[in-house]
Amino acid sequence: MANQLILLKKDFFTDEQQAVTVADRYPQDVFAEHTHEFCELVMVWRGNGLHVLNDRPYRITRGDLFYIRAEDKHSYTSVNDLVLQNIIYCPERLKLNVNWQAMIPGFQGAQWHPHWRLGSMGMNQARQVINQLEHESNGRDPLANEMAELLFGQLVMTLKRHRYATDDLPATSRETLLDKLITALANSLECPFALDAFCQQEQCSERVLRQQFRAQTGMTINQYLRQVRICHAQYLLQHSPLMISEISMQCGFEDSNYFSVVFTRETGMTPSQWRHLSNQSD
């Protein structure tokens, strides 16, 4: 694309030997669609926003993890106190003898699955390593780049150990109620979600859980679920031949008219308009 914004290495790395650095987004503002001369890992710490990656929308919040390749195009919109960190790296500059392809989805042709989640335990461990990595990447001593790369290796191994598919928190997990709730919501795209039943199963207070969720994500539980469903609907409208009424059902709306009302309110256009516009841009 002729007018595509490209983020350049020279604007983020101190020299041509530096392989890894950290870019803080405290908070992440609206950011136009762009690609990069480098790759990045994106860790979301709190708040929420709309992350559009290669034309697929994701409603992101605390614990979301993305593996972004240089050629991927993405943007951030509808942000609300969104706090994240970008760990950016140049694959060709990495010197450490590590099987990076096994650790990083999409690394130099490896199988790519961009979106994962981290629970509280994984987030805490990753944050500690990222803090050290940020310190070293800003260092000026002769071993700073080597130390930063060692820490990057530790980070990608930590992420591989703790990451899980967005709708598949391991049954043996010791993660928090909030992590379990977000996974349960991801499993409720097509069917109603009963918070009271979830709280009864987990033996927790519904009121306290609602407060915790809003404090960490900046949204109510219902708002989050609705927006996740709308993101899924946007994807299906663009990439599937399903009728709008069928997409409505697959996104948890039994009434297609109500689905159209909610979709229009959230996106500013009807499902038909969205599909038409998306097909034109393909």
Curated annotation (Swiss-Prot):
CDD domains: cupin_RhaR_RhaS-like_N
DNA-binding interval(s): 196-217, 244-267
A Pfam match: HTH_18
Subcellular location: Cytoplasm
Keyword Protein transport carried by entry: no
One GO molecular-function entry: sequence-specific DNA binding
Chief location category: cytoplasm
Intrachain disulfide bonds: none
Site label Interaction with sigma-70, positions: 246
One GO term (biological process): positive regulation of DNA-templated transcription
Keywords attached to this entry: Activator, Cytoplasm, DNA-binding, Repeat, Rhamnose metabolism, Transcription, Transcription regulation
A GO CC term assigned to this protein in UniProt: cytoplasm
NCBIfam families, per database record: PRK13500.1, PRK13501.1, PRK13502.1
Function: Activates expression of the rhaSR operon in response to L-rhamnose.
Description of how the protein assembles with itself and partners: Binds DNA as a dimer.
Name of the protein in its database record: HTH-type transcriptional activator RhaR
Taxon lineage: Bacteria, Pseudomonadati, Pseudomonadota, Gammaproteobacteria, Enterobacterales
